[in-house]
Swiss-Prot record:
It comes from Canine coronavirus (strain K378). This is Spike glycoprotein. Residues 32-1394 are virion surface. Residues 1-31 form the signal peptide. Residues 1108-1152, 1342-1384 form a coiled coil.
Length: 1453
């Protein structure tokens, strides 16, 4: 049926004839001329590894079909249930580009994207393109494909917008010898086109069916036309490829178990030692010396660079040896490298779910010094010193616990632990680390070689041995195993690593800073006369054996300091420069404490000096550390800290002594690497290269350059942010500048490749050599800027003619890397739009009531910082004072935030007594307070009372001023943590109950305070808003009017645009009442319907979910804050009292300091979350105020602000921590689509100007008759545009302003950076504190009681069925609220005045016109009366002029 419908659709569009299998005949492409090796060429073209590899996939190994037809019509065929599709050309004329064949279209169906391969052989399509480039692969999101566009239109009309296009050639040199095709899965697509394979990362749901459209006349000659053969592949096959010394062979791999294991575990490393893309990483694990990563994506340094991969199907009984140095890579699969081998990885693949190791297996580690340690495991515990039974490491799944030991000559040196239940990988590093499944199982001295013997028997074992080196890579881990690797080995991959994604979308990305690595060290010091002291420390280790033969370092080991003042216990530095060195010796004894023999074998040990409690390391003392005083002592008296001296054996480290340090901070004494006595300037400068510098005590990494500047004052110069800008060499006065090693740059990435980069300096980067300049940056690109007009000059839009793929401000970057301006419009005497876009304008409406919840306030929280951190311990409180004002800052931040919020809420919530009296169903239907003219109305509430009874408060509800919906909301919500403040606090202070989480919060200084707003006040506020709607809605008055008239006043505004007449009000009222009734039922039944909620209840469900989240978020945060008291933050205990009981005061202070740091960090995280939440609520509160003013108190003219539609009126109800708005809107049901113009760009010769519409509520569009019209956006009412509707603007360019976060305060004055506020808190802490990792992503979430009802419904099928039936009825009722209004298609609307207004106007005209005529005609010097008077006066006397006084110049001061 589907195929028939599709055929009919295709026929209707393209006159397509659907063919059946009878129209296609089987063919064999290898029988065509030159196609004997087509399969081999295809496989080896895709996989170039050497020497052998097994590949699996959906390869073209099935039947080929030739579907050529005798008629010249276009034909259609479907391929179903396939995972790959291939096609090949039988022949095509090898011309100069004008192919004479017919087109082919291949459509791979999927969601959300589909892929189309289109081969156009028409002369018109080929001519404007490069020769032989008339194939196109299009990745499109279009759901409906118009095949006629592809088979007739030019390429410029197809694959538009965001569709990805890959053009390719389809006429190879040897006709018909190349296979084209697609292979797909849910993660990526492989396209075999243009003599290469494209790996496209596409996450998609493929339907596994393909549609092809083709056309070929069988009457055409072989030399003049093309015929295609097709193959859809549904079977997964394996091939074994061998490529040795250029000799290529292949064979079908039919042993499924062998082929699967080989293809899964064996690969051929590519050039450089990289693991090829697509490898499964079966049983490859991350190396870790601490915790194991479960899942995630991160950049790490791992042994993933393969120097040699040795596939081993099975081992014999003989022992195998593998060495790190001088390894012979004679059996490598693929390339082999001579790099240093860091880790040898044994990757194991076992198909049997039983114990796989059939014989004895012992790993022998040849460590430094020739001592061989053995790693073996036993199935029971062994208590004797000699292990008479032979152990083994069982590979695969073990049948019981295995206890592992490190052995030497049959003696257990160390118990390692229990072997994992399933051993999949063993990795051994040359530095002595032994990993099992990625975990560091054992560490010893560096290892030279590894040997072991293994018998796999018939277990189906399959091995690979990889000689690997460490490299940086982006690793994706799933369930602790590696799933995908992206090497950070190129410019584009470095960006991928910095963005933590293997697939980069088109756009601009910051260029990751290159790792500095090992660089020269520059030191700048003041010249001085140096006296130097060399301190040589000798450590004599004493080693002996335990009763079981394990090596033990004696505490009688000796430390010798240089003699000073006949004292060898304390040595103080008395010079201004010093260097510290130590060397160790090792002596052993049998059982006593007389150490007079050299240490051999496992008794050999070396001395190491560990940091201990000092804030600096022993090996860093000679790295220019400065002190005022520095002494070494063997006694702890007066010491500031100590170094731990340990003996390091092949199995462990044992602390034998302590070396104490007495020091004072300062800069009089400096530790230096070597002796430089005398008058010296010890400064060492490395110019014009990246260097690690220490300049007058300021350290960093940068490039030092000599300048020509002259500055008389200062030694070094910094910016306002503290960065070092330059310094002066006091010896010669030369000024040097210091600049970063890396410059700021942004790379333009298109289709996974870097095509350009914007940088601040004119220097080549990212391998880009071609450049041009703009007013703001330099641009480097793959585009060849060699023209004199573009090289080094500002770019002009005429330089490059291309379509930008990505944009940055008003600049675009094309696929070829060219940079173009995108806001310049060129025209000559023609009218062009500034910008256009299709818009839909409604032509008819229905009514809808939409629910919206907005949070208004949060519950304030008070925290006693010292109580939370120290729980009243006096010693802890003393330590807490060292953190300066940390607690004060935390407490003030919470207090100020709470006060600010309370002030804002208090100013927002005000209640009108008059309005509150009317805010009830009873008052709306009462005539006591109304004007007498309304008392005769049968229903004061009007037609709208049926719906209002659930929104308006009722005196008969549980509480006064609450509506039915408010009662439902407050009854349904159950708060978590500290919701009911009074009840919880009273219960906790009783002391008779076991302290639960709520009590623990109060006991530890956390208390929720009652806020300004509560449920009753919010209910009164919203009720007052409802009552205020009917106060003075017709211009103001002391007496309320019926709600129906208030609503009618709101409808009058809409009537001016939508022709809503009075007779439609009853229709709207009925729809409103029905919608409100169904929403009320939805609030009551959403607990029964949350899992099967439909579209009709989606709004209500979302609102309740948001209410639940708002109410419980703070409780969850407080619960998590309290749970942090159980975290020990790497201390020995989470109890402060317990720590002081178990340790001495000094050690306990160090442990408690960790608790203080961790708990302050937890408080800071909570404060940061609270401040962020308050900022969000502040914005939400402002939004609520705006909606109250614009939606409730008035009628909004903004479309979508008060509900998604044309706003009529809104009512508000109180809800937990906020308000719920019920927006009554008109929703469009019919639309007219027009192409809107934002303006007109007109030119006349050299003059160019723009015209834009004056009224922003009007839309300018060009109709089908090529005439311009204006129409309101709210209703399609086209009128002819006039000149008065436009405003002229200067030009047509569209400009944008780029701003950084630093620039935002200058643009938005009230912008607050919350992160900076928290940073200010952290800066007040001690500088030497350490912040532990404190993830806040797991909360003890508490949900509404809806969840329990949902779970209960799952066990009551009968009730669920009934609920489903009720919901179906309810959904139908909601859907029935959509009503059609009467539509009158009127272009213009005239307002008619009543008859008495016209009568009044007539009387005024009759009275005023005679008076005006008399005044104008009879008065004045030229009037009738004036003329008559002048004549009479001139006859009787001569006209006299009045005398006047002369005017003098007056100066006013």
């Amino acid at each position: 049926m589907i195929v028939l419908i599709l055929c009919l659709l295709l026929f209707s569009y393209n006159s397509v004839i659907c063919t059946s299998n009878n129209d296609c005949v089987q063919g064999n492409v290898t029988q065509l001329p030159g196609n004997e090796n087509i399969i081999k060429d295809f496989l080896f073209h895709t996989f170039k590894e050497e020497p052998s590899v097994v590949v699996g996939g959906y390869y073209p190994t099935e039947v080929w079909y030739n579907c050529s037809r005798s008629a010249t019509t276009t034909a259609y065929k479907d391929f179903s249930n396939i995972h790959a599709f291939y096609f090949d050309m039988e022949a095509m004329e090898n011309s100069t580009g004008n192919a004479r064949g017919k087109p082919l279209l291949v459509h791979v169906h999927g969601d959300p994207v589909s892929i189309i391969i289109y081969i156009s052989a028409y002369r018109d399509d080929v001519q404007p393109r490069p020769l032989l480039k008339h194939g196109l692969l299009c990745i499109t999101k279009n759901k409906i494909i118009d095949y006629n566009t592809f088979t007739s239109a030019q390429w410029s009309a197809i694959c538009l917008g965001d569709d990805r296009k890959i053009p390719f050639s389809v006429i190879p040199t040897d006709n018909g010898t190349k296979i084209f095709g697609l292979e797909w899965n849910d993660d990526y697509v492989t396209a075999y086109i243009s003599d290469r394979s494209h790996h496209l990362n596409i996450n998609n749901n493929w339907f596994n069916n393909v549609t092809i459209l083709y056309s070929r006349s069988s009457s055409a000659t072989w030399q003049k036309s093309a015929a295609y053969v097709y193959q859809g592949v549904s079977n997964f096959t394996y091939y074994k490829l061998n490529n040795t010394n250029g000799l290529k062979s292949y064979e079908l791999c039919e042993d499924y178990e062998y082929c699967t294991g080989y293809a899964t575990n064996v690969f051929a490393p590519t050039v450089g030692g990289y693991i090829p893309h697509g490898f499964s990483f079966n049983n490859w694990f991350m190396r870790t010396n601490s915790s194991t990563f479960v899942s995630g994506r991160f950049v790490t340094n791992q042994p993933l660079l393969v120097n040699c991969l040795w596939p081993v199907p099975s081992f014999g009984v003989a022992a195998q040896q593998f060495c790190f140095e001088g390894a012979q890579f004679s059996q490598c699969n693929g390339v082999s490298l001579n790099n240093t081998v860091d880790v040898i990885r044994f990757n194991l693949n076992f198909t049997a779910l039983v114990q796989s190791g059939m014989g004895a297996t012992v790993f022998s580690l040849n460590t430094t010094g020739g001592v061989i340690l053995e790693i073996s495991c036993y199935n029971d515990t062994v208590s004797e010193s000699s292990f008479y039974s032979y152990g083994e490491i069982s590979f695969g799944v073990t049948d019981g616990p295995r206890y592992c030991f490190a052995l030497y000559n049959g003696t257990a040196l160390k118990y390692l632990g229990t072997l994992p239940p399933s051993v999949k990988e063993i990795a051994i590093s040359k530095w002595g680390h032994f990993y099992i499944n990625g975990y560091n199982f054992f560490s010893t001295f560096p290892i030279d070689c590894i040997s072991f013997n293994l018998t796999t028997g018939d277990s189906g074992a399959f091995w690979t041995i990889a000689y690997t080196s460490y490299t940086d890579a982006l690793v994706q881990v799933e369930n602790t195993a590696i799933k995908k690797v992206t090497y950070c080995n190129s410019h584009i991959n470095n960006i991928k690593c910095s963005q933590l994604t293997a697939n980069l979308q088109n756009g601009f990305y910051p260029v990751a800073s290159s790792e500095v690595g090992l660089v020269n060290k520059s030191v700048v010091l003041l010249p001085s006369f140096y006296s130097h002291t060399s301190v040589n420390i000798t450590i004599d280790l004493g080693m002996k054996r335990s009763g079981y033969g394990q090596p033990i370092a004696s505490t009688l080991s000796n430390i010798t300091l240089p003699m000073q003042d006949n004292n060898t216990d304390v040595y103080c530095i008395r010079s201004n420069r010093f260097s510290v060195y130590f060397h160790s010796t090792c002596k052993s004894s049998l059982w006593d404490d007389v150490f007079n023999s050299d240490c051999t074998d496992v008794l050999y040990a070396t001395a190491v000096i560990k940091t201990g409690t000092c804030p600096f390391s022993f090996d860093k003392l000679n790295n220019y550390l400065t002190f005022n005083k520095f002494c070494l002592s063997l006694n702890p008296v007066g010491a500031n800290c100590k170094f731990d001296v340990a003996a390091r054996t092949r199995t462990n480290e044992q602390v034998v002594r302590s070396l104490y340090v007495i020091y004072e901070e300062g800069d009089n004494i400096v530790g230096v690497p070597s002796d430089n006595s005398g008058l010296h300037d010890l400064s060492v400068l490395h110019l014009d290269s990246c260097t690690d510098y220490n300049i007058y005590g300021i350290t960093g990494v940068g490039i030092i350059r000599q300048t020509n500047s002259t500055l008389l004052s200062g030694l070094y110069y910094t910016s306002l942010s503290g960065d070092l800008l330059g310094f002066k060499n006091v010896s010669d006065g030369v000024i040097y500048s210091v600049t970063p090693c890396d410059v700021s740059a942004h790379a333009a990435v298109i289709d996974g490749a870097i095509v350009g980069a914007m940088t601040s300096i004119n220097s080549e980067l990212l391998g880009l050599t071609h450049w041009t300049t703009t007013p703001n940056f330099y641009y480097y690109s793959i585009y060849n800027y060699t023209n004199e007009r573009t090289r080094g000059t500002a770019i002009d839009s005429n330089d490059v003619d291309c379509e930008p793929i990505i944009t940055y401000s008003n600049i675009g970057v094309c696929k070829n890397g060219a940079l173009v301006f995108i806001n310049v419009t060129h025209s000559d005497g023609d009218v062009q739009p500034i910008s256009t876009g299709n818009v839909t304008i409604p032509t008819n409406f229905t009514i809808s009531v939409q629910v919206e919840y907005i949070q208004v306030y949060t519950t304030p929280v008070s925290i006693d910082c010292s109580r939370y951190v120290c729980n009243g311990n006096p010693r802890c409180n003393k330590l807490l004072t060292q953190y300066v004002s940390a607690c004060q800052t935390i407490e003030q931040a919470l207090a100020m935030g709470a006060r600010l919020e309370n002030m804002e809420i208090d100013s927002m919530l005000f209640v009108s007594e008059n309005a509150l009296k009317l805010a009830s169903v009873e008052a709306f239907n009462s005539t006591e307070t109304l004007d007498p003219i309304y008392k005769e109305w049968p229903n004061i509430g009007g037609s709208w009372l049926g719906g209002l009874k659930d929104i308006l408060p009722s005196h008969n509800s549980k509480r006064k001023y609450r509506s039915a919906i408010e009662d439902l909301l407050f009854d349904k919500v159950v708060t978590s943590g500290l919701g009911t403040v009074d009840e919880d606090y009273k219960r906790c202070t009783g002391g008779y109950d076991i302290a639960d989480l709520v009590c623990a919060q109060y006991y530890n200084g956390i208390m929720v305070l009652p806020g300004v707003a509560n449920d009753d006040k919010m209910a009164m506020y919203t009720a007052s808003l409802a009552g205020g709607i009917t106060l003075g809605s017709l211009g103001g008055g002391a007496v309320s009017i019926p709600f129906a008239i208030a609503v009618q006043a709101r409808l009058n505004y809409v009537a001016l645009q939508t022709d809503v007449l009075n007779k439609n009000q009853q229709i709207l009222a009925n729809a409103f009442n029905q919608a409100i009734g169904n929403i009320t039922q939805a609030f009551g039944k959403v607990n029964d319907a949350i899992h099967q909620t439909s579209q009709g209840l989606a709004t209500v469900a979302k609102v309740l979910a948001k209410v639940q989240d708002v109410v419980n978020t703070q409780g969850q945060a407080l619960s998590h804050l309290t749970l942090q008291l159980q975290n020990n933050f790497q201390a020995i205990s989470s109890s402060i009292s317990d720590i002081y009981n178990r340790l001495d005061e000094l050690s306990a202070d160090a442990q408690v300091d960790r608790l203080i740091t961790g708990r302050l960090t937890a408080l800071n995280a909570f404060v940061s979350q609270t401040l962020t939440r308050q900022a969000e609520v502040r914005a939400s509160r402002q939004l609520a105020k705006d909606k109250v003013n614009e939606c409730v108190r008035s009628q909004s003219q903004r479309f979508g602000f008060c509900g998604n539609g044309t706003h009529l009126f809104s009512l508000a109800n109180a809800a937990p921590n906020g308000m719920i708005f019920f927006h009554t809107v008109l929703l469009p049901t019919a639309y007219e689509t027009v192409t809107a113009w934002s303006g007109i760009c007109a030119s006349d010769g050299d003059r160019t100007f723009g015209l834009v519409v004056k009224d922003v509520q009007l839309t300018l569009f060009r109709n089908l008759d090529d005439k311009f019209y204006l129409t309101p956006r709210t209703m399609y009412q086209p009128i002819v545009a006039t000149s008065s509707d436009f405003v002229q603007i200067e030009g047509c360019d569209v400009l944008f302003v780029n701003a950084t976060v630093i620039d935002l305060p200058s643009i938005i004055p009230d912008y607050i950076d919350i992160n900076q506020t928290v940073q200010d808190i952290l800066e007040n802490f001690r500088p030497n504190w350490t912040v532990p990792e404190l993830p806040l992503d797991i909360f003890n979430a508490t949900y509404l009681n809806l969840t329990g009802e949902i779970n209960d419904l799952e066990f009551r099928s009968e009730k669920l069925h009934n609920t489903t039936v009720e919901l179906a009825i309810l959904i139908d009722n909601i859907n029935n609220t959509l009503v059609n209004l009467e539509w009158l298609n009127r272009i213009e609307t005239y307002v008619k005045w009543p008859w008495y207004v016209w009568l009044l106007i007539g009387l005024v005209v009759i009275f005023c016109i005679p008076i005006l005529l008399f005044c104008c005609c009879s008065t004045g010097c030229c009037g009738c009366i004036g003329c008559l008077g002048s004549c009479c006066h001139s006859i009787c006397s001569r006209r006299q002029f009045e005398s006047y006084e002369p005017i003098e110049k007056v100066h006013v001061h």
